[in-house]
Amino acid sequence: MIDGDAVIHELILPGSAGQVFDMFTDARQLIRWIGISADLQPRPGGRFRFEVTPGQFCEGQYVIVDRPVRLVFTWGWTDPGFGLAPGTSRVDVTLAPAGDDGQQTRLRLVHTGLTGDLGLLHDDGWSRFLARLAAVTGGGESAAYPRERPAGRLTALHRQRAGKDSS
């Protein structure tokens, strides 16, 4: 969901809050659902960098690391053509137990600082990756992230941002 300059996603995931938290802060777990390589320093002030798709890098800095309830970090892309430099947006992930057995977690992700079509692009991206996270926390494996996006408006926006389309 897009609300002003923010993208907001809420979902219930299988697994404890600690297990879900680790999916964001352990490089081996992170690349199971988002990215193909990762270098993470999950502590306040620590940096992260991961390759989302071949040649596309996301970078940021951890602001709050409060396992297993909250993770806040800055976010941006190393490619200046994408229009969102590292540190110019912020992601706030909160986790809370859901259900009576402690084996489900309510995740709320709020990504702020996204103006114009960046909100639409990141809403699409988070939707895709959080679905992959749900598959992995449910005991499955996530399929490889598609290199090509389905045809449509988002494809045109991605190509335009990457400088691959003049339209």
Segments the model singles out, each with a brief description of its role:
Residues 20, 30, 48, 62, ...:
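Hydrophobic pocket/interface hotspot
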Residues 2, 8-9, 15, 19, ...:
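Short beta-edge strand/loop motif at the mouth of beta-sheet-based domains
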Residues 23-24, 65:
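Conserved catalytic core of Hanks-type protein kinase domains
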Residues 24, 34, 75, 137:
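Short, flexible helix/strand-to-coil boundary loops that buttress conserved ligand/catalytic motifs
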Residues 6, 80-135, 144-146, 166-167:
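Beta-strand/loop substructures that line and gate deep hydrophobic ligand-binding cavities in soluble
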Residues 31, 38-39, 55-104, 111-112:
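Hydrophobic-ligand binding "helix-grip"
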Residues 52, 75, 158:
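Pocket-edge structural micro-motifs
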Residues 135-167:
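Short, highly charged C-terminal tails/helix-capping segments
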